[in-house]
Swiss-Prot record:
SUPFAM superfamilies with a match to the protein in the record: S-adenosyl-L-methionine-dependent methyltransferases
Pathway in which the depicted protein is active: Cofactor biosynthesis; ubiquinone biosynthesis
Swiss-Prot/TrEMBL GO biological process terms: methylation
Protein name: Ubiquinone biosynthesis O-methyltransferase
PANTHER family reported for this sequence: METHYLTRANSFERASE, UBIQUINONE BIOSYNTHESIS O-METHYLTRANSFERASE, MITOCHONDRIAL
UniProtKB keywords: Methyltransferase, S-adenosyl-L-methionine, Transferase, Ubiquinone biosynthesis
Spans traversing the lipid bilayer: none
Length: 240
């Protein structure tokens, strides 16, 4: 393997991959470990579709697609979707579920850096949801996403802010008290401040268009989008 390919393959945290491999068979269990992803998916999909001016007929790449929850929902909107992930088991689950659902999605096991080297400028929309905090070099992912989108195309990121409140909500609350996600899912040191993400975006051809927070209300047990990016947040960018 040459140096360039080695670098492209290096942006993988194998411990993170193993976490999701272990629970991949339950990816589509609406009451399982991925219940929060199923519950927030309509919000994510709605935000992406609205900000991108619809998805019908567009070529879309979902980076870090896992078992295919978002990828399938975008395909249902009429998009031609490719899903990328480095986890073998999640991709097998995604392929099987798409087959059973009669949904056409192409799933590929490779890094976004590898994909960008072969498919630069080929996508109308690129999504990277809850993935940046699970790789060693998130800035490299941002660069690759910028390379993959067409001029004027849209790139969406979502991740977790790094602060005390985010640690309390996403780690202590979600993992240990409410048990919404498995213990050890998140590492607060890998969370990303909005200013950091915007700084990486500024070093690419992407331009910030909109940012919103994703909020959970434990009293009503509901999620909503709105102002405030102190815990979960989503960023819409557009290629210049």
């Amino acid at each position: 393997m040459n140096t360039e390919n080695l670098l492209k393959n290096n942006n993988v945290d194998h411990e993170e991959i193993a976490k999701f491999e272990a629970v991949a068979s339950r990816w589509w269990d609406l009451e399982g470990e991925f219940k929060p992803l199923h519950r927030i998916n309509p919000l994510r999909l709605g935000y992406i579709a609205e900000r991108a001016g619809g998805l019908f007929g567009k070529k879309v790449l979902d980076v870090g697609c896992g078992g295919g929850i978002l990828a399938e929902s975008m395909a249902r909107e009429g998009a031609t979707v490719t899903g990328l992930d480095m986890g073998f088991e999640p991709l097998q689950v995604a392929k099987l579920h798409a087959l059973e659902s009669g949904i056409q999605v192409e799933y590929v096991q490779e890094t976004v850096e590898e994909h960008a080297a072969k498919h630069a400028g080929q996508y109308d929309v690129v999504t990277c949801m809850e993935m940046l905090e699970h790789v060693p070099d998130p800035q490299s992912v941002v660069r690759a996403c910028a390379q993959l989108v067409k001029p004027g195309g849209d790139v969406f990121f979502s991740t977790l802010n790094r602060n005390g409140k985010s640690w309390l909500m996403a780690v202590v609350g979600a993992e240990y008290i409410l048990r919404m996600v498995p213990k050890g899912t998140h590492d607060v040191k890998k969370f990303i401040k909005p200013a950091e993400l915007l700084g990486w975006v500024d070093q690419t051809s992407l331009k910030e268009r909109h940012m919103t927070g994703l909020h959970y209300n434990p009293i009503t047990n509901s999620f909503k989008l709105g102002p405030g990016v102190d815990v979960n947040y989503m960023l819409h960018t557009q290629n210049k």
